[in-house]
Every structure is written in structure tokens, then in C-alpha cells.
Amino acid sequence: MSNHRSNFRDYQREGIRANNAGTSGDAVRQNGNPISVAKHVDGKKSVYMLFLRQIGQKKFLTEQGHRYNQNDQADKDIMTRYYHGMCPDLKQKFEREVAEHNGNRGLVIKTKHQRAQRNREMRHRNPDEFQQLRRAHLETLSQTPSVIALPRDINHVLHITEDLDAFCLANRKKAKRIMTSYIAQRSDDPGNPLLCEDYTMQIVSVFPVAYAFKPSINKLSSYPAEISVTTFNLKNGIIQNESRFVKFDAAWFYPDADDIGHEELSRKAMADELGISPNGPADGCEPYEVFEWLQHLLKQHPKSPILCDRAQFNFVYYGIKTLATYTGINAITFFQEVIIPSILSIQDFTSVILEKAPTDVPRVWRDVDICNQFQYHFLIPRTELNLFCSFHENKPSPTKYNCVKAHNARLLDNFFTVIKGNRLQGFVISPPVHEICIQDGSDTSLPQTILARTISRNDAEVYAARQRDTDEQYDVHQEGPSNHDQYEFASEPLDFEEDSDEENYNEQLDVPYSYNDHFISSSSVREPEHPSARSRDVAPNVQQESVVVPAPRRLSPQRAPRPSQNSPNAYSERKSFSAFPSEDPSEDYETPIISHIMNRNEADQYFNILDSVKPGQKYKIIKFDDF
């Protein structure tokens, strides 16, 4: 009986998706499809699977001369091309069929039971093949590093161009629903409800002193130098316009002293654009003070959308994230629960207004026309409206116009230009309230918007491949590389089942698994850890029932190990796990204080799963790109 339970626990790894490997070609069903080792089945249909079964496999066999192999990357690329080239009418037919099926809960449950029963029958009908597959699967897992995979929201990784587009699209749809509801609630009021004085919006701009993507840890590092918040409405224009400089805490931002010199050229390039020192502004405020100021302004208008320039979206997003991380746990919570759901590019918000609000033109501007207008940079903010900070007011061009207050003014001027060009009902242009900048197309010194660049998914895949090649040069029994950034990625492919849905298809065929779902940061994370020892928004004597999931980290020669008592929230009664299989790891490695904090029950659950699956094995504990 105990042996049966032990075997049963081997199948209970669906909670740890990283341990879900693919299937072997030796064990197949009677129809030629592989038998999956995964227990989970889904009763829903997907457009891709309908296409694959009804059209894709036959077309592939006819044109390529052999059967489609889902484990062959070349075959997957060809099938992806077939799928995207599908006839629109046929795709709509599949979509209707999928919507009709998935919308019927009873039918979904019935299909799920039927598929589970079929899988059980196949396993009992071919017990030898299935046991062979299971043994091969367990052998593969035993040869790879085991991983505790904590869930992470992909929305927190926006340096990938495709992920940023998806994030902006999701928040745009949310803003559209909110505006539709607002207009419906004010339908009995006379005039355009968007022209009320209580309908306010806020623009936030950030210019960083340090901004760089680090492929080794799959993170964007952005430390703000200046931040500005502009509150306005459609009737009165600018209501409030403030900015702050941020003190550059190099010791906190660069845990290793060598990094300061490595990124000096990058910081100098960014600082020169803003006219400040690479070591940050001389009279900047403390980062936690700036975040508290920002939080105060945003709380004054809790229902207002938070707008920013799409071209500098990551300047704003990661800059505020850095301030929240520096400030403390409550600041992180405010960032996650208030700022992330509300932040939206001003270009997308303008499109939402033109789509939902009444206009006096037969056809409103398209998205591309709106984006082109916001790229117009031959604008000089009016001096009498206090649209420059005191530092940049007397600076020469082009440094003067990189001031974040001036950038907000130029964004707002283009916003009103679009509203005026589409003749929003009830909107009356009133200079200088709605014409806050002077157009001067002859001034070639006016700078264009500095872009917060992102990387495509293909480039990210290349970086990951390079890192994996570097990792393979070092054996785990050796002391390890001299540069601790060379221990980075750990992931396993998902099991692509016959009945998987379209989302799993996208993970398998369109993008690498490690970038789409569980892209893992290694122990050598050099993004600033949360300064819990000096947290500004948490009482220092508060003790929390928590367990730290440690991650191995190479000691910097300039620093001694930090004692665990330095962090009030970081303690554990378990023995630290090592990334190295030897019983006596090198003394050059330490366990960092802060990694990923779970409550004790959740931590015990993960450790119990690991102990039951592979008792006595050493595990490499890692964490995701999250707070």
C-alpha cells in the first residue's frame, strides 16, 4: 500500500510545472500520438487544436511529405506559419465553435471526464509502454536541477516588446470599460460628462540616471533622476504641476562596488541628456520621500487614470517600481494594487476618448495618426505657465526640453491638439489653457523624445542561449565561475499534450518557454534588494511569521557575509539548500538574506512535495522577477 502511495505521489507534480517534461517517442497511443505523463486534462476546446486536427496535420503531410512532429522545432515553425495563414472565414468558424463549447459548463465538464477516461484506458491498454515512458521521465528529472517555481505575473516583465504591448492592451481595455461605465452613469447630465471639472487625469513622467537591461538576470534596472506629476482636466487644463529630483543612492542600487564603474558610461550618457552629474542630482530628495510625495498626489485623485508617454513607458514603470522597492513593503503594495492597474499610455487613453466620447466628425483619427501627433516635438512650453523646473528653466537647449515637467507639457499640448482635431462635443479651445506650447518648426535644437527601448522576444532568446552556453562551460563540482552572473537560468519545457489549449500552443511554438511563463532569475540577482533593515513604511519591531527561500550567491570580495539578524522579516528554521551537490560547499558562497518570502504553511507545502518526490536530493532554490 505504501508503495502504491509512493507511486501515486510521483504523479502529483502538476503543482510544480517546471517538473512537467515532454513525452517520449517510444510510448504512443494506437492513433500514433504520444501518451502523456501529465494527469491534468482540460475539457475546453481551442482554435489552434481544431485547426491542427482538421487541417494542419493533413496539410503538413501533403506539403512536407512526412507527419508533423510536435517535438521538432522546424516542424513547429512551419505549423505556426500555417496557423497564422489560415483563412479568416475558417478562423471565425472555429472561434464560434470554441466559444459555443467553452461557454457550456456542463459540456466542458463532460468532455474533461471523457478525455481523462480515454487517457486512463490508454495507459492500462499499454502498461509496458507507459511504465517505460514514466521511467524515462523520472530519469530525465533526476539529471536536471530541481526547481521550486513560484508563480509570477508576466505583466511584471515589460522589457520584452511583445509583453509590453500585451500589458498596454489589457489596461486600455480596462480603461475603455471604466469610461463606458462613467459615461453611462452621467447620461442624464447635460453636456459631455468628460468636460466636468471632477473628471481629472494625471500624467507622470520619469527620466532615469541609470537605465539598462541586464540579460543575465532578465531584468530592467532603472533609477529615476527626476519625476513629474501633472494633474489636468479637459475644461481647465493644468490644475497642478510638480516635479522632484531623486538622490542617487549608489551603495543601495549597486550591491557590488564593481558595477558602479561598469555602468559609468551608460549613466553619463543619460545624465548628460538631463544636464546632471552621473552620480545623480546634487539637491535631490531621498527616494522614499519622493515616493511618499508621489503617493500623496495620486491619492488626491484616486479614480483618475495614470497616464505616461508610450515611448517612455518603461522609464515610468520601472522608475516608480525602484522607488517603491526602496521605500518598503507598503509602498510595494501600493505600486502593485494602485499604480499597475491604472497606468496607461496617453496615446491609448486618447484613442479610448475618441472611441467612447461623442464627437462632431464622421471619422475619428486612427491609432497611427494619434501616435504620429504625439511624436511632434517642435513645441516650446510657455514660460509664463511655469512648465519648467527651477533647475532646467535657465538651461540651454536641448537639455532644457528634457525636463520632465516640460515633457508633460508637450504631451498635454499634443493631447489637446488631437481632441481639437476630432471636435469633441462641448470642447471649446481656450488659449493658453489648451495651447500650452508654442509651435516652432524652424527650431532644429528642439530634441525628440528619448525612447525607453525594449528588446524583442527573438533577441531575448539569443541572450538566453548565450547564457546557457556559458553555464555549460562550468561543472557543478568545480569551484564555479569568477563572475557570479554566469549562473543564471534554470527551466524545463512544458508537456505539449494533444488536448492542450491555444495558450499552451503559444508557449510552445511562438516563444521560448522560459520567456513566456516562468522566466527565472538566478541567485546572482543584482537588482537592489528591499532594504528591510531601514524600511520607512514598516515598524522596525514587527515580527512576521515567514520563511525565506534562500538562493546561493557568490560573495563579493569587498564585502563580508551579512548576518541574518539584520533583517527582521528574514529567518528560517530549515537548513539552507545549496546549488552544489557536494556536502561541503565552497566557503566562497553565502545564503543571501532576502530572496522570496513565503508564509510558513506555503513553504512547508513546497518542501513536503520535494521530499516526497526525491527524498534526500539537494535542490537549487531560486526566485522570480517579482517583489
Curated annotation (Swiss-Prot):
The entry's cellular-component GO terms read: RNAi effector complex
BP terms from Gene Ontology: regulation of miRNA-mediated gene silencing; regulation of translation; regulatory ncRNA-mediated gene silencing
The region annotated as signal peptide is none
Bias type Basic and acidic residues, positions: 7-16, 467-478, 526-537
Top-level lineage group: Eukaryota
Q: Name one Pfam family in it.
A: Maelstrom
Keywords, alphabetical: Repressor, RNA-mediated gene silencing, Translation regulation
Nucleotide-binding is among the record's keywords: no
What residue spans carry the region label Disordered? 1-31, 467-487, 523-589
Q: Which InterPro entries match?
A: Maelstrom
On whether Repressor is a keyword of this UniProt record, the answer is yes
Consequences of knocking out this gene: Insensitive to RNAi-mediated gene silencing.
Membership in a protein family: Belongs to the maelstrom family.
Q: How does it assemble?
A: Interacts with rde-11 (via RING-type zinc finger domain). Interacts with ergo-1.
Q: What does this protein do?
A: In complex with rde-11, required in the endogenous and exogenous siRNA pathway for biogenesis and accumulation of secondary small interfering RNA (siRNA) intermediates, such as 22G-siRNAs derived from ergo-1 targets.
Name this protein carries in UniProt: RNA interference defective protein 10
Q: Which organism is it from?
A: Caenorhabditis elegans
